[in-house]
Amino acid sequence: MFQYWLQSLKKVTQKIMNNLKKKYLEEVSEKLKEEFAVKNHMAIPRVRKVVINIGLADAKDNAGILEKMSGNLGALAGQKPVVTKAKQSIAAFKLTAGQSIGLMVTLRGEKMYSFLEKLFNIVLPKVRDFRGVSDKSFDKSGNYNLGLREQIIFPEIDYKNIDKPRGLQITINTTAKNEEEGKRLLELMGMPFVKGAING
């Protein structure tokens, strides 16, 4: 039953994704071109990729945690994640270089649009007492960093397949030249910023 529901969700998400991509190409890009006086079409700000990271410090002592969370992340991202490993040994944390310490997935193209639309319209509104995300999490290059406290707010996650709530970090990498362009790009694409935060 769950698998049937998941397949149905993927079909709906695919349709939504096509709408977001279409919206960017037909509406968002044109508004950005006009507002920022962009002459070269290739210079119009766009989302380049979305990177999702989950830190699993306890995975070094329990391989089952890594396997279970790999399934969770793969389900919510729509793509198989890669394992991140410690680059150096840290005695204080009993960490050895090469040990598995997390998972990461990088989304581009169709899967990227699919994930963003789901994030903006389905996932974030499910956060308790949600009033919008901060517009203060951009870097100087217009990339946005978002931290979520738990993976269970994603519709693909089955409660039976989680050992405990785990946070994840989402980075939306853009081609924007600065913070202002990055903010406007995501606002037009539907990022639910705190009301009145943009240009306020």
What are these regions (language model features)?
Residues 13-200:
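Ribosome-associated RNA-binding proteins
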